[in-house]
């Protein structure tokens, strides 16, 4: 199934929502390290309160969940073999870009080389799913030949049966 431009853009948006929010969630959840309670139940409740009453954490979390919802909706009409590599690979790139913008160390030249190779690979996945007009014509021509061959085989088989039983 060929992916439309809208489907590809929706998957890129999902990757941006997932990858772009990860460094923000990491930074905002640093307050969890300071939470210390005597029992695991109180610890859990205090951690939930610390996270979900913190708008610095809550906004990226909600955006991340919007990405998950968009992914779910997009999967209904998109080929899974295209959706998974686009979202997962580009999410890593968006994580590195946003992390770098926030001042994190992203790993230097090797990370940049990895991002370039990832974009090239995703581009190949996307373009291989598109159907170029002349390839569609070749496919139709090939199907016609296959149908002709199939019909010929059926005629010969039915002729052989009638000779055997006739």
UniProtKB/Swiss-Prot annotation:
Q: Which domain of life is it from?
A: Eukaryota
Keyword Membrane attributed: yes
Q: Name one Pfam family in it.
A: TMEM234
List the transmembrane segments. Answer: 1-21, 82-102, 112-132
Q: Where found in the cell?
A: Membrane
**Gene Ontology cellular component?**
membrane
Q: Which UniProt keywords apply?
A: Membrane, Transmembrane, Transmembrane helix
Q: Is Transmembrane helix there in the keyword field?
A: yes
Membrane topology recorded in Swiss-Prot or TrEMBL: Multi-pass membrane protein
Q: Identify the PANTHER family for this entry.
A: TRANSMEMBRANE PROTEIN 234
Tell me the protein family, please.
Belongs to the TMEM234 family.
UniProt-recorded name of the protein:
Transmembrane protein 234
* Organism, scientific name: Pongo abelii
């Amino acid at each position: 199934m060929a992916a439309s431009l809208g489907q590809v853009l929706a998957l890129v948006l999902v990757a941006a929502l997932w990858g772009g929010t990860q460094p923000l969630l990491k930074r905002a959840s640093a307050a969890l390290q300071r939470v210390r309670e005597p029992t695991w139940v109180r610890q859990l409740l205090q951690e939930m309160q610390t996270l979900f009453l913190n708008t610095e954490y809550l906004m990226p979390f909600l955006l991340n969940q919007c990405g998950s919802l968009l992914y779910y909706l997009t999967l209904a009409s998109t080929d899974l073999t295209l959706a998974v590599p686009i979202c997962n690979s580009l999410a890593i790139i968006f994580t590195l870009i946003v992390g770098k913008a926030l001042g994190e160390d992203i790993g230097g030249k090797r990370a940049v080389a990895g991002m370039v190779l990832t974009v090239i690979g995703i581009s190949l996945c996307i373009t291989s799913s598109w159907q170029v007009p002349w390839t569609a014509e070749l496919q139709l021509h090939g199907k016609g030949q296959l149908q002709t061959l199939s019909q010929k085989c059926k005629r010969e088989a039915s002729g052989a049966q009638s000779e055997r039983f006739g």
